[in-house]
Amino acid sequence: MANTKTQEVVAAETNTGLSTNVSGIEIDVEDIEIPRINVCQKMSQSDAPVGSILFDKTYEIAPPDTPVKTITVAAQKGWRENIPFEEEDIPRIAWSKSEADAIAAESEWDMTEFAEITLLMRQPEGSENDDAFQLPIGDHNYALGKINVGKNAYRSTYKRLATFAALQSGIPIHSKVWNFVSEELSKGKYTWFNPSLTVTKEEADADVTAFVKNFLGA
């Protein structure tokens, strides 16, 4: 019961639409193409350094162990079949526990939790990567991106957001600045880089909060 409540707190606003903007175009959140955020691994097909945070498959946002000031815009929990990489089957996805249970009842694979998290990353001090940070909001430039997290990455990002939402229910997640960082993890003979979100004491600027509310259609 507690898990369900936490999920609703974090993701309740992700499906609402945007009102008509000054361009006169009726826009819905689903109509917006948000670039992907990835953490480069040894097997990644990218020239970026291993462990770096990559935006839109092109821009290196930060090297490993270097926090990026970030606002969490939205987060949505889901479930998918835990199919090994060597298999050719495409995992089926569910966005509710009932849908996940229905898939699990007929699947040979276990269902595993994952999340889609939309982040507003602030341009670091001294960064000249202006092409990546094309959203001027208040006194800073930002990049709006989305990251898909599962397993260890799910625990170090979405679960921390959900815990904050449950324990600080009167404080919107987007009102706080979070440190977004790529960290090296090891298990046995395997080593990889894992995304992590940690809340800070810094409050988000009023302009940023207004942007997020407008984006979510609040």
For the regions a protein language model found, what residue spans apply to each?
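OB-fold ssDNA-binding interfaces and closely related basic DNA-contact patches used
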Residues: 1-137, 187-194, 198-204
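Generic beta-strand structural signal
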Residues: 113-118, 131, 140-145, 171-178
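Short linear motifs at secondary-structure transitions and domain/linker junctions
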Residues: 85-97, 152-157, 169-175
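Short acidic, glycine/tyrosine-flanked loop/strand segments centered on an H-E-D-like triad
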Residues: 123-164
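Long, compositionally biased interface segments
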Residues: 162-218
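Residues in well-ordered beta-strands of folded domains
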Residues: 118-120, 145-150, 181, 198
